């Protein structure tokens, strides 16, 4: 997702600015005169393609600076003050360990209706009204859980339907979703697999865990995209450990919220979609 790539860029600029301010230096941020209106930036961002090259036309470069500047301002409100230095690993690790957080297990237990839902099979077309997944709680993983390679998710069995059937379900699902979700064929298949076959009878906690893992994979891809752009990867490595954790957790929740919204949308219309 290009949007997530720009979130990383913006938050890293913010974190770098804070670190530079702590050391008595000021990091240059793009001139506010080039910042476009918020709604214009929101409309433009999804339509752009990923460009890692420096050979970018002036008008496009100008547009991207505007978008990044807009995100910098938003990021400044969200990300906490950067830790003192990357080299001070023990202090940073200790600080991260003391920060209040919601681990995966705790978050799953506290999610509304999780216990009740886990005691009975998932709703089918003939069961009670679909119980959607709460979007009011978030995850915050500690440093030790981000300090390892995010393992690719085990392949889940996809619905055994023809490509034509998958395309039909995908097109119908896109129309049901809010415009900002825009699910892909792959994402539709992942959600479909939770409401068809053996997975539909698994408890709510299992479904949440699947969505968390899918969100982690999204973060992993975002980092790989950033790594492919040398200047952004260098900037990432200059930022404090604590700030990196904040950025990763913020991205995790951006993706996790999106997956939950898509899950709820599919679940509400599951019988109609699967019957296509």
Curated annotation (Swiss-Prot):
Its main localization is secreted
Sequence segments annotated as region (Disordered): 97-130
- Keyword entries, A-Z: Host nucleus, Secreted, Signal, Virulence
This protein's superkingdom? Eukaryota
Give the subcellular location. Answer: Secreted; Host nucleus
Which residues lie in Basic and acidic residues bias regions? 101-119
GO CC entries: extracellular region; host cell nucleus
- Keyword RNA-binding applies: no
Q: Where is this motif: RxLR-dEER?
A: 48-65
Instruction: State the family named in the UniProt similarity comment for this chain.
Output: Belongs to the RxLR effector family.
Give the function comment from the record.
Answer: Secreted effector that completely suppresses the host cell death induced by cell death-inducing proteins.
Its UniProt domain note says: The RxLR-dEER motif acts to carry the protein into the host cell cytoplasm through binding to cell surface phosphatidylinositol-3-phosphate.
Q: What is the name attached to this protein's record?
A: Secreted RxLR effector protein 120
Annotated source species: Plasmopara viticola (Downy mildew of grapevine)
Q: What is the lineage of its organism?
A: Eukaryota, Sar, Stramenopiles, Oomycota, Peronosporales
